[in-house]
Every structure is written in C-alpha cells, then in structure tokens.
Regions:
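Iron-sulfur cluster-binding electron-transfer modules in prokaryotic oxidoreductases
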Residues: 1-200
Length: 200
C-alpha cells in the first residue's frame, strides 16, 4: 500500500512509515517508471512521494492502455460492446486531482459502444464517496449516501455498463447498484476489463 488510506484518514505517521518503506525498496531496485491501476496510488506516488525522496514517472493504467492502442501495440477487435451503452465515472484522484480525463474516454472510444456522459462529469464529476475514506467507515446521518447519489446519476444514462478506472470507485458503484437493485442488469467494469474483453 502507498499509504494513501492512512493519510486520508488523518494518520500522517502511518502514511510516512508506509511511504518511506516503499521508497526504500523502489529506490533499491532503481525503479524509474510505475504503472498503477489505482488513482489514489497514482496521486500519492506522483504528488506526495517526491518530497519524501521517491521520484518516479507515474502512469495510470488508462494512460498506458491508451498509449498502447495509439502505438498499435494493443489491438481492440471491437464488436463485443456493439450496441452497449457505457457511462464513465471520473475518479476524483485521476480527474480533478490530476486532470486525466481523456485517456479513459479515448479507450472507450475504441469499443463499439456508445459513451453517455453523466450530468456531472469531468471537472464537475461527483465523488463516489470512497475518496474521503467513506468506504472504510459506517454511514453517517444524512439524506443520502454519496455513492447512492452517484449511482443514480449513472443510472439516468440508462447504461449497460458503468465504467471506471479505480478499484475504490468500482466497489462504491457496485454497492450503489445493489442498493438500487440494478446489479443484475447493469455491471461496473474497469477500463482494463473492457479492453481485456474486447481484445480476446
């Protein structure tokens, strides 16, 4: 773990312990580039590790997949998603924290599917609730949990698939679908899962 959950929960000491341990190992192996499938790790490695001595080129897997497709190193056959409606949820630590919006959409564009944007997307995207460590704690009093609100926005697009690129978001949105009793009809898939399906 990069230490992100500890830091977001307010435990700076534990974060630094985890970060320094990771940096020591990564530097021992002279690591220059890291590809991560988690926007939380992406943000932490890219923006917080440098001040602790961890300087790496950090790439999110949607950026890497987009690059591989563009360079012709990964072929997407399409067809698997022909006629499917996909909506994309922007993870906070990928989008608003690091301005990565186009790479995941470029990947979805290569599928034979239709991308339907939610009313709150890109810079105005709504958090699924996991970014504030909500998935690790009990519900708080209020009108509605944020992951339910975000799931409702996704369902407004009448999707077959809700795509994202964050394991935390995928969990929160899957839970939201179960809450709305839509988990049998609508699936939550990571961008990498979509590409894996389309390249078989």
């Amino acid at each position: 773990c990069t230490g992100d959950p500890a830091k977001r929960a307010g435990n700076e000491f534990l974060f630094q312990m985890q970060a320094f341990s990771n940096i020591e190992i990564l530097n021992q192996y002279n690591i220059k580039k890291i590809v991560t499938a988690c926007p939380h790790c992406f943000n932490t490695l890219k923006n917080e590790y440098p001040e602790l001595g961890g300087n790496y080129e950090v790439v999110h897997h949607t950026q890497f997949i987009s690059y591989l497709i563009k360079e012709g190193k990964l072929t997407v056959s399409g067809g698997s998603f022909n006629g499917k409606r996909i909506t994309y949820h922007d993870p906070c630590y990928l989008g608003r924290a690091n301005n990565v919006y186009e790479a995941p959409r470029n990947v979805i564009e290569k599928l034979d599917a239709e991308l339907y944007e939610m009313k709150n997307c890109k810079e105005k995207g709504l958090c699924c609730g996991a970014g504030g460590a909500q998935m690790f704690k009990e519900s708080e009093p209020g009108n509605k949990e944020v992951n339910i609100k975000r799931t409702e926005q996704a369902l407004e697009t009448s999707p077959n698939i809700i795509a994202s690129s964050c394991p935390f978001c995928n969990t929160m949105l899957s839970d939201g679908l179960k809450n709305k009793e839509k988990h049998e009809k609508v699936k939550v898939w990571d961008i990498a899962e979509l590409i894996n399906q389309a390249s078989q």
